[in-house]
A protein has these predicted regions:
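Short beta-strand segments of immunoglobulin-like
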Residues: 36-40
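Boundary at the C-terminal end of the N-terminal hydrophobic targeting segment
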Residues: 21-28
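Bacterial N-terminal signal peptides
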Residues: 9-20
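Short, solvent-exposed loop/edge segments of extracellular or virion-exposed proteins
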Residues: 30-34
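Non-catalytic cap/lid and distal C-terminal segments of serine-dependent acyl enzymes
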Residues: 27, 41-68, 72-381
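Bacterial N-terminal signal peptides that target proteins for export
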Residues: 1-9
Length: 381
């Protein structure tokens, strides 16, 4: 066993005790594996990390590119406390002598083009209530489904949310929202990092949105753009649209009690998933009437709004009749330009709803908020 492998193995040795007064005043992160006491989060929103790696020479915590040096005690325990972090979900890694590894005390999440650790910095209970599990309401189910793609000549996987009443109201069919992840993530993102099931359960129970089926599939963009030689922006994730139109939608409508008309079909996505949403829906308006982009990677303004998507925006009256919901949202601290796009669409006579998530960046808290705003708008016709 070489030294690097030995060091990674050492990192896998956890402690479940409390080691310092400052850490004892913090609480265990909700994203930890069962029984693990670290990482912790204190009331100042600082994260506390601790790992046993007695043979390591240098250990850092890497949170979305910001690195914190860890200090070693005499027994080989390394610890670090971060600066206050913004509320919400953060991907992170441990860097042990230059090798980036997942903290074995964290649940694993697919993000940044690989499996990673994650830590949730909580909001206050009232603010976070919309994405928090509520024991006093009915809960839907999330199924893992597999189907075969003739286009890819491979098995694919999707996750499907059904509302709580789906099992008992067997005479009812439901509208369907196809909900896409972003670059470097996969079909697990909305269920795990995005807390979509809690958001849906809470809204349905409160009567804020209609009961619906939600489908989360892999958008063929789970790696970081530029990793494949010669790939252009137009190529990135482009193979997903034909799979969705020709294989995923028929699979869902065959296996679930789904309404099959365009008025009861929606698509939304975050970041590159927003890009895929526009690429899929705006070229297939015979199939979709509700569209949402959450911090969407949208570039069409550069060529003029009248040329975008085969000129779909040139006849505003026709577009407004066909598209019942056209939603754009983003965080106020990011620069993805959804505000400029919304204004350009409005100036062109295109009805749209713009939402600004106050104080958030290109992150899961922005997208949870966007989903929470989008859901009450759809399927209301």
């Amino acid at each position: 066993m070489n030294n690097t492998i030995r060091k990674i193995a050492i990192v896998a040795f956890l402690t479940f005790g409390c080691f310092s007064a400052s850490a004892a005043e913090a609480f265990t992160a909700s994203t930890n594996i069962p029984e693990a006491q670290y990482p912790k989060v204190d009331t100042d929103r600082c994260a506390h990390f601790r790992i046993h790696a007695p043979e390591a020479r240098d250990v850092k915590v890497d949170i979305c590119g910001t690195k914190y040096d860890m200090t070693r005690d005499a027994d080989g325990w390394w610890s670090a406390v971060t600066q206050p972090l913004v509320v919400g979900f953060h991907y992170y890694f441990l860097v042990v002598d230059g090798v980036s590894v997942i903290d074995p005390a964290s649940e694993a999440f697919y993000g940044c083009g690989r499996m990673s650790g994650g830590i949730e910095i909580p909001e206050d209970a009232e603010t976070a209530a919309y994405y928090t599990f509520n024991k006093d309401i009915p809960h839907g189910q999330v199924r893992e489904c597999r189907y075969y793609s003739d286009i890819e000549n491979a098995q694919r996987r999707c996750f499907v949310y059904t509302p709580a009443e789906y099992e008992t109201r067997t005479d009812r069919r439901y509208p369907v929202l196809y909900l896409q992840h972003g670059m470097g993530e996969d079909e697990r993102g909305w269920h795990q990092q995005g807390r979509m099931a809690d958001i849906l359960d809470n809204q349905i129970a409160a009567g804020k949105c209609v009961p619906m089926i939600v489908v989360m599939d892999y958008g063929n963009c789970g790696y970081i753009f530029g990793a494949r030689p010669g790939e252009t922006r137009a190529d990135f994730g482009a193979t997903f649209t034909p799979i969705m139109i020709n294989e995923l939608i028929p699979f869902i409508e065959k296996n679930f009690r789904a309404l099959t008309d365009r008025d009861n079909r929606a698509m939304a996505g975050l970041s590159w998933g927003g890009h895929e949403t526009f690429q899929t829906t705006l070229y297939n308006l015979d199939k979709f009437s509700h569209i949402g982009s959450f911090s969407g990677a949208l570039f069409f303004l550069a060529d003029g709004i009248d040329k975008a998507y085969n000129g779909v925006f040139t006849d505003a009256d026709n577009f407004n009749k066909r598209v019942h919901t056209f939603f754009l949202g983003m965080g106020t601290e990011e620069g993805f330009g959804s505000d400029r796009i919304s204004k350009a669409l409005t100036d062109a006579g295109i009805n749209n709803t713009y939402f600004a998530s106050q104080g958030t960046h290109h992150e899961w808290l922005t997208w949870r908020r966007c989903l929470n705003e989008f859901l009450p708008l759809i399927f209301k016709q």
